A protein has these predicted regions:
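Extended, charged/polar low-complexity intrinsically disordered regions
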Residues: 1-93
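Signature of the SF2 helicase/ATPase Hel1-core->accessory helical subdomain module
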Residues: 128-132, 167-180, 209, 238-349
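Inter-Walker segment of RecA-like/P-loop motor cores
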Residues: 212-249
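Conserved pre-motif I regulatory segment
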Residues: 59-157
Length: 349
């Protein structure tokens, strides 16, 4: 009897279709080619008009490669990124973004703009790219298409010490901008609460301190009333994910008490992806089911099993392949000259 042919192996990086889609949108195929140029002090900071030097280089490449995105649109995104960076840096002595942080924020601007402007057309464009990737890998990738309902999550795979906290704070501002703009056209669009899910009580306190430093109103969730107000104008509720349960008890709260149209930001989002603690993944998914989620982790790759033959593992890998918008994992961090214990503070020179 002939041996059954095994499916060709696909690397985890091959699954990152969303990340490659946006690299292509600005005229490149890999982050390293941008880093070789932009990982330099001469590109950090702003020009005389208040725009980043990163913006000028990316606009030049996009124009040279005949990308559909215009210089004016890139400048518009750049101006918002600069404004948000200035706002969260006022109490920090100013912030100067690194190139990988800037690209993360640029891709987020591009995604949210398309997501809120014309979700159907955006979904079609993403699926055309998936079709081309499936063909390029001769069917080995076998990525299922996006659906409109599956587009409400972005994930950032960024190395420890690379400044994920600052990304989170600017992501909040980015989302609120596009949400408010969309509400002018469709008044029924709404977010119930903005929630930061932290892995433990100590990290909740750290998030509160960091959000306060960035000038963003926040409170640590209190079951008896604190942090339960609706709407982003009431500030952000920081919740230790261990306090979420199916049914609330003395020190916990039922996940369903928050409704499902929330903006949820998940720290250390790799937690909850294993079969032993998958309940946390279920809880946070329900919180953002009719809203939106931003997830952050240095170790998505380690938490996801790209070589598994189990259906549930392959589905999870595909889900995050279509959600990870930035891969600045440790290999890039190390390659850019940052050591294992390095931490970026983004201090303005």
């Amino acid at each position: 009897m002939a041996k059954k042919k095994s499916s060709p192996s696909v690397s985890f990086e091959t699954y990152l279709v969303l990340f490659r889609y946006f690299l292509g949108e600005i005229g490149t195929t890999e982050l390293k080619s941008l880093g070789n140029k932009l990982n330099s002090i001469e590109y950090e900071g702003l020009d005389e008009n208040g725009n980043t030097h990163f913006h000028h280089y990316i606009a030049q490449i996009a124009k040279m490669k005949h990308c559909s995105i215009t210089t004016d649109k890139l400048r518009e995104y750049d101006e918002r990124i600069c404004r948000y960076t200035k706002e969260i840096g006022e109490n920090r002595g100013g912030i100067s973004l690194k190139y990988f942080q800037y690209i993360s924020l640029l891709f987020t601007e591009m995604y949210l703009d398309n997501y809120f402007a014309d979700r159907s057309a955006f979904c079609k464009s993403l699926n055309e790219f998936i079709d081309s990737e499936n063909a390029r890998t001769l069917g080995a990738l076998a990525m299922e298409p996006y659906t409109i309902s599956s587009m409400n999550k972005l994930a950032y795979m960024c190395a420890t010490g690379s400044g994920k906290t600052l990304l989170m704070h600017i992501n909040i501002k980015q989302f609120i901008f596009y949400l408010k703009r969309a509400k002018r056209i469709n008044g029924s669009i709404a977010i119930n609460k903005i929630i930061v899910l932290s892995p433990n009580e100590g990290m909740s306190k750290q998030h509160l301190n960091e959000l306060t430093l960035s000038g963003i109103k926040a409170t640590i969730f209190n079951k008896d009333g604190g942090g339960m107000s609706s709407g982003q104008n009431e500030g952000i509720a920081i919740i230790d994910m261990n306090k979420l349960k199916e049914e609330g008890k003395v020190k916990t709260v039922s996940v369903d008490s928050f409704e499902r149209n929330n903006l949820v930001l998940v720290d250390e989002a790799h937690r909850g992806m294993s079969s032993t603690d998958g309940v946390w993944y279920d809880y946070r998914t329900r919180l953002s089911e009719e809203g939106f989620a931003f997830e952050y982790s240095a170790t998505f790759k380690q938490a996801l099993n790209a070589t598994s033959s189990k259906k549930e593992d392959r589905q999870m890998v595909a889900e995050y392949g279509k959600s990870i918008i930035m891969d600045y994992s440790y290999k890039y961090f190390y390659g850019d000259g940052y050591g294992k214990d390095y931490r970026i503070y983004n201090l303005r020179a």
